[in-house]
C-alpha cells in the first residue's frame, strides 16, 4: 500500500517539507532548481546529523544557490550543478529516506513558507506565499526505484559547483497574498501502480497530452503563464480545445497577468481562461492538471523549454481523492480569479 500526501502552498506544503527534512534518518537526495537560506539550514543540519545528503541545483546563483552549495559542502554534503547551457535543471524532486516528494515550487520562502511552530492548518497562522502544489508518496518500491534512477542519472550528468556562478535574469518577484481558507494536507491510500513519476520536459508534455486526449469529464489546468507561440504549448491548447468540443469541461487558470501578446489568443479560446490576482488571493506558481479522476503535479512551465529540453519532474496520481483535493484548491483559486479580457 502506498501512502500519498497531497499538500498546497502556502497553506501547508512548506511546513510538511520542513517536517520531512527534519525527520530524515539516512539520506536526502534533492534536485531543486533553487534552494535559498530558508531551507539551506535544514539540509546543512541533516548533513551535520550524519545523513548522506546530495543536492543538485540549477547553475545560477539567484536565491542563494551558490551559498547553499558552499555551505552544504562545508558541512560534509555533496553538491553539484546542472542546467548549464540553454536547458534548465528546473525539477523539484526530494527523496528523503523512503519518501518521494514532487512539487511545483522551489525551496525558498516565497514558494514554501512554513509555520514557525510547524503547525498545520487550521492550527497555524495563515501564511503568505505563491500558490503551489506538492505531493509525497511513501511505500512504493516501484516509485522509489524510479525516483532513485532519475536522481542518479541527473547526478551523473551534473558537475561540481564552479568558482564563478552564472547570473540568472533578474525577474520581478510576483506579489503574494494570503489565500483563504488555508487547508491541511490530505493523506490517501492507493496502490503503487496508480502513482507514476515523469522525468523530462518532453515526457511531461506527453503525459499532459495523453491526459487531455483521454479526458471525458473535466480538464482543469493551472500554470503561471502560457507561451502559445511555442509548438508544445500550442499542441496542449489544441488538445484542450478538442476536448472542449466533445463536451469535456475545460478551463485554464494562469498564475498572473498574461503577456499582452498572448491575450487575444487566450480570449479567443472556446474554454474559459482566468488569471489569479494577489489582491484577491495570491499569485499562482503551481503547474498542474486535473483530468477526470487523475492529477499531474509538475515542475514544468508551459513554455518551449519547459515542455521539451528542461530537466523537469512530475508525479501522476490516479486517485479520485487526490484529484478532488487539487480540484477543490483549483476551484477556490478560480472563484477569486479575474477573466482574461482584451
Language model segments and positions:
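Charged, low-complexity intrinsically disordered terminal segments
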Residues: 1-81, 87, 95-342
Amino acid at each position: 500500500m502506498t501512502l500519498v500526501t497531497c499538500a498546497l502552498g502556502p497553506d501547508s506544503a512548506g511546513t510538511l517539507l520542513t517536517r520531512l527534512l527534519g525527520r530524515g534518518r539516512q539520506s536526502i537526495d534533492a534536485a531543486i532548481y533553487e534552494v535559498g537560506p530558508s531551507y539551506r539550514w535544514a539540509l546543512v543540519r541533516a548533513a551535520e546529523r550524519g545523513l548522506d545528503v546530495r543536492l543538485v541545483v540549477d547553475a545560477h546563483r539567484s536565491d542563494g544557490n551558490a551559498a547553499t552549495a558552499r555551505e552544504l559542502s562545508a558541512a560534509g554534503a555533496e553538491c553539484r550543478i546542472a542546467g548549464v547551457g540553454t536547458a534548465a535543471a528546473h525539477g523539484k524532486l526530494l527523496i528523503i529516506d523512503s519518501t518521494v516528494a514532487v512539487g511545483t515550487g522551489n525551496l525558498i520562502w516565497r514558494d514554501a513558507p512554513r509555520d514557525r511552530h510547524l503547525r498545520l492548518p487550521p492550527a497555524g497562522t495563515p501564511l503568505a506565499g505563491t500558490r503551489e502544489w506538492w505531493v509525497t508518496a511513501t511505500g512504493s518500491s516501484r516509485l522509489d526505484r524510479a525516483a532513485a534512477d532519475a536522481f542518479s542519472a541527473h547526478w551523473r550528468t551534473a558537475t561540481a559547483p564552479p568558482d564563478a556562478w552564472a547570473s540568472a535574469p533578474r525577474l520581478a518577484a510576483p506579489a503574494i497574498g494570503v489565500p483563504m481558507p488555508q487547508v491541511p494536507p490530505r493523506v490517501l491510500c492507493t496502490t503503487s501502480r496508480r502513482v507514476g513519476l515523469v522525468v523530462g520536459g518532453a515526457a511531461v508534455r506527453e503525459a499532459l497530452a495523453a491526459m487531455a486526449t483521454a479526458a471525458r469529464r473535466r480538464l482543469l489546468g493551472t500554470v503561471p503563464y502560457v507561451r502559445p507561440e511555442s509548438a508544445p504549448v500550442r499542441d496542449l491548447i489544441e488538445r484542450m480545445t478538442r476536448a472542449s468540443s466533445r463536451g469535456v469541461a475545460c478551463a485554464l487558470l494562469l498564475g498572473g497577468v498574461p503577456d499582452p501578446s498572448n491575450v487575444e489568443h487566450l480570449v479567443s479560446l472556446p474554454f474559459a481562461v482566468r488569471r489569479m490576482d494577489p489582491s484577491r488571493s495570491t499569485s499562482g506558481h503551481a503547474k498542474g492538471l486535473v483530468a477526470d479522476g487523475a492529477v499531474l503535479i509538475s515542475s514544468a512551465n508551459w513554455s518551449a523549454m519547459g515542455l521539451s529540453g528542461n530537466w523537469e519532474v512530475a508525479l501522476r496520481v490516479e486517485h479520485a481523492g487526490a484529484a478532488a483535493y487539487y480540484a477543490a484548491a483549483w476551484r477556490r483559486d478560480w472563484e477569486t480569479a479575474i477573466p482574461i479580457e482584451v
